[in-house]
């Protein structure tokens, strides 16, 4: 007894027939029949509910129907199970095709029917149950028309509504940020402030007052002061005395705001004392006034470029 006869004699015969629909009647084989070579038939049992639905269909290729002159139209259960005849000539289901299911897992099976996708998605074209559909002609025409309109709009210099919306959002953000930062008042930065150049050397100190363009207004050195001539100009307080003298002269000239630039290969403590001495000479040691708006150290910094000269032997 082969596998087909075992399927036919099983208790789930009706479920097997319903699962492989399109059969009007079933021939029950005897135990001496193989089901394929044409054994003896005992009775034909029609399937309930199937005769009325399939009365208009032809009996070609069904088991138990009258044979046709063309024997190639007859198919076995193996062919039906493999789904070889699941599509007709004009794209319709064949009489012996397996039934369709609206389950989402049906598209993964090898016997998915071509009309399954059309049943689950009636608005989309049929692609044979593969789950993918080619774009229709109307959607392609709409896409080409929209792209042509965008090109014409860009060529004519027009601006789309999307760009206008983005521009409005940017303008609103600019107004908000401007409103936030308007509460913070910027200090009055002096653009044409005079500059005080303090150059501190080992044996002398040079202090020069210039305008914003570099024109010299006044200058002084440690040796120019009457009290610091000779060896006294090499003392520690010579830079402070020179800066204080220039502070008094700058006050007499009517300067209001200055920028101090210090230069010298020494620690910043001496530079700080010179800057404070200039402020005291300008304000007559009054702490409520300060003409200095900016301080900058312009000392050159070596980046191991040139070799230093040989140190002097003592």
Swiss-Prot record:
Biased composition (Polar residues): 50-63
Compositional bias per record (Low complexity), positions renumbered to this chain: 103-114
Keywords, in A-Z order: Developmental protein, Karyogamy, Mitochondrion, Ribonucleoprotein, Ribosomal protein, RNA-binding, rRNA-binding, Transit peptide
Disruption phenotype: Failure of fusion of the polar nuclei during megagametogenesis.
Compartment list: Mitochondrion
Coiled coil: none
Stored InterPro entries: Ribosomal_uS11 (IPR001971), Ribosomal_uS11_sf (IPR036967)
Transit peptide (first-last residue): 1-37
GO molecular function: rRNA binding; structural constituent of ribosome
Subunit structure: Component of the mitochondrial ribosome small subunit (28S) which comprises a 12S rRNA and about 30 distinct proteins.
The name this protein goes by in its record: Small ribosomal subunit protein uS11m
Annotated organism of origin: Arabidopsis thaliana
């Amino acid at each position: 007894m082969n596998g087909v006869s075992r399927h036919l004699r099983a208790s789930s015969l009706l479920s097997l027939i319903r699962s492989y629909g399109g059969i009007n009647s079933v021939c029950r084989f005897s135990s001496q029949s193989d089901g394929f070579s044409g054994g003896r038939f005992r009775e034909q049992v029609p399937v309930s509910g199937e005769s009325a639905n399939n009365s208009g269909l032809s009996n070609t290729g069904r088991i138990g129907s009258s044979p046709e002159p063309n024997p190639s139209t007859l198919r076995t259960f193996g062919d039906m199970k493999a789904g070889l005849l699941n599509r007709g000539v004009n794209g319709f289901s064949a009489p012996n095709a397996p039934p369709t299911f609206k389950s989402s897992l049906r598209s993964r099976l090898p016997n998915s029917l071509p009309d399954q996708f059309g049943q689950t998605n009636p608005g989309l074209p049929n692609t044979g149950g593969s789950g993918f559909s080619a774009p229709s002609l109307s959607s392609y025409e709409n896409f080409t028309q929209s792209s042509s309109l965008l090109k014409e709009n860009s060529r004519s210099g027009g601006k789309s509504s999307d760009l206008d919306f983005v521009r409005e959002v940017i303008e609103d953000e600019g107004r908000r940020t401007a409103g936030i930062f308007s509460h913070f008042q910027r200090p009055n930065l002096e653009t044409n402030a005079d500059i005080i150049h303090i150059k501190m050397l080992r044996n002398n100190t040079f202090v020069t007052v210039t305008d914003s363009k570099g024109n010299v207004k006044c200058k002084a050195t440690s040796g120019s002061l009457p009290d610091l001539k000779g060896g006294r100009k090499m003392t520690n307080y010579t830079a402070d005395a020179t800066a204080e003298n220039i502070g008094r002269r700058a006050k007499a000239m009517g300067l209001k705001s200055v920028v101090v630039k210090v230069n010298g290969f020494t620690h910043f403590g001496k530079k700080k004392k010179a800057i404070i001495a200039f402020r005291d000479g300008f304000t007559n040691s009054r702490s409520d006034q300060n003409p200095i708006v900016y301080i900058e150290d312009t000392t050159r910094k070596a980046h191991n470029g040139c070799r230093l000269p040989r140190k002097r032997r003592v």
